Every structure is written in C-alpha cells, then in structure tokens.
C-alpha cells in the first residue's frame, strides 16, 4: 500500500487510475479491503466502488474511526462534484463482546447515529475468528467453515447481498 500511495502521489488523473485498471475485472462483486487511512489508494478505491461497508469493532477507537470514515466519504464525494458514486451500504459491527458494558454502549451510540445503516447481524468475537489468520486461512476455510464465526459471517454476507439487491431495485432492505 505504501508503494502504491507513493506512485499515485506523482501520477496525473490519479483518482481514476484504479477505475481504469480494475474495469477489466469480469465479476459482479469485488471486495477490496483497505487500510483505514486517507491516502491516494483510498481515494482511488472510492472512485471505483459502488458501495462502502464500514466494519466497526465495539470499542472507543472503532466508534471514533466509524465517525471519521463517514465524514471522509461524504466530504470526498462532495469534493468530486458528482464523479464519485460510492455510497455507504452499511456499518457492520465486528469482533464484539456483546455482554460487556462498553460493547453495549458503542452499539447504542451506533444505533443512535446511524440506525438505518447498521447491519442486523453482529459478528461476535470467537476463538475461530482469532485463530484463522494465524493459520493463513479465512474464516470459511478454517476448520472447513464449521465454526460459529463462519456462520456469523455467512449470515452477514447474506444480509449484505440482500441490501445490495434492494438498493439496486431502489428500495430499502427489510432483511
């Protein structure tokens, strides 16, 4: 990412570079996981995508980061004068410890500010979610997907797909 940011900082038409490069991908859905920074790479990605999903860990930094991302996306879109089509599809609560007071407080704060964007499916912290990266596997590969973590992410993916279809049909998701 650092090398890409450095290269992009010296490139003309840098906001459309990723769009040009990625337009040849023949898939209906492409997931791009970016670092929570606001460099050239993030701006390029925002120019390419239709939707942004904001993952939020239920702690102070997660809530603060969500607020910053929401503000940044709005400000970037405004600065691009209609050229950026990205919109926030939703906010996904991840790695939550739902019985803790802090997680409950953060969830309440998210509901208060962005209730219409919160996904209903919450990803609770689990051993499998912690262990999968250590074995260089995603949650669906780890233990052949037979984990609570994989089931939670599967339900979240279904909710995301339902919301995308609803948005494309011009209506709110009732999922």
Region spans (language model):
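Charged catalytic carboxylate motif
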Residues: 17, 68, 152-155
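C-terminal lobe/tail of nucleotide-utilizing enzymes
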Residues: 78-175
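Cytosolic-facing regulatory segments adjacent to core modules
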Residues: 1-38
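Short, flexible helix/strand-to-coil boundary loops that buttress conserved ligand/catalytic motifs
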Residues: 5-6, 42, 133
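Flexible, glycine- and charge-enriched loops at secondary-structure boundaries
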Residues: 8-12, 59-62, 146
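Conserved NTP-handling cores and scaffolds of large molecular machines
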Residues: 16-17, 73, 77, 164
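Conserved catalytic-core segment of NTP-binding enzymes
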Residues: 24-120
């Amino acid at each position: 990412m650092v090398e890409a940011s450095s290269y992009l900082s010296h490139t003309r038409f840098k906001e459309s570079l990723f769009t040009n490069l990625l337009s040849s991908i023949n898939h209906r859905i492409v997931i791009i996981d970016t670092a929570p920074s606001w460099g050239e790479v993030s701006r390029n990605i925002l120019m390419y995508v239709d939707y942004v999903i904001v993952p939020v860990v239920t702690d102070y930094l997660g809530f603060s980061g969500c607020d910053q991302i929401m503000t940044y996306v709005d400000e970037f879109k405004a600065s691009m004068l209609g050229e950026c089509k990205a919109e926030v599809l939703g906010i996904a609560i991840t790695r939550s410890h739902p019985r803790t007071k802090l997680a409950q407080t953060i969830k309440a704060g998210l509901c208060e500010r962005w209730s219409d964007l919160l996904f209903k499916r919450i990803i609770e912290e689990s051993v499998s979610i912690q262990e999968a990266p250590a074995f260089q596997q995603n949650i669906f590969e780890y233990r052949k997907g037979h984990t609570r973590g994989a089931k939670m992410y599967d339900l979240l993916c279904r909710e995301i797909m339902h919301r995308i279809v609803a948005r494309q049909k011009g209506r709110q998701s009732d999922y």
